[in-house]
Amino acid sequence: KQRVEFLEDLLFTHRGLSGPAVLQISSYWQEGTPLAINLAPTVDLPAALAQAKARSRKLIANELATLVPSRLADTWAQREADWQRPINEATDKALARLAEQLARWELTPTGTEGYKKAEVTLGGIDTRALSQQTMECKTQPGLYFIGEVVDVTGWLGGYNFQWAWASAHACAQALPA
């Protein structure tokens, strides 16, 4: 089982999860497979919550809103009665549970928006079937494949565009004048 991690933005929309993190993981996700999402990947949640408990009397949701978006903090704090109180009144066990759940939110997506809305595709002509220099099919001379029809997948950030341009250039250089 392959473990894949991304440190990218995550968007909550009216249709579900989206954003760069979802687009990245969609290349690897298999239907029915759960995902574990760290909702505060750059924060040491146990330490931050312990520090807040020692110095603050704010509601847990309000302290949490200094670490994650406020609407997420409000929604998350509503999940358990132990989290609906001032942070200095919370038990260490309740805060540890909160930190663990935020750092490892597990869910199983019910599906994708489908091919019509896809921004990431996988598959295509196996690169081993093509000349690396010309993109010509090894078994069918005169037949060339470039860009997204070839099984090359890059991370977000223009890599697929770069691959399309580079493979087109290699192919064009090889074509007879």
What are these regions (language model features)?
Residues 18-21, 125-126, 149, 156-160:
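Gly/Ser/Thr-rich beta-alpha loop segments that engage phosphate groups in nucleotides
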Residues 44-45, 109, 168-170:
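Short, intrinsically disordered/low-complexity patches at protein termini
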Residues 74-153:
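A glycine-rich dinucleotide-binding beta-alpha-beta segment and adjacent secondary-structure elements
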Residues 152-177:
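A conserved FAD-binding loop/helix module that cradles the flavin
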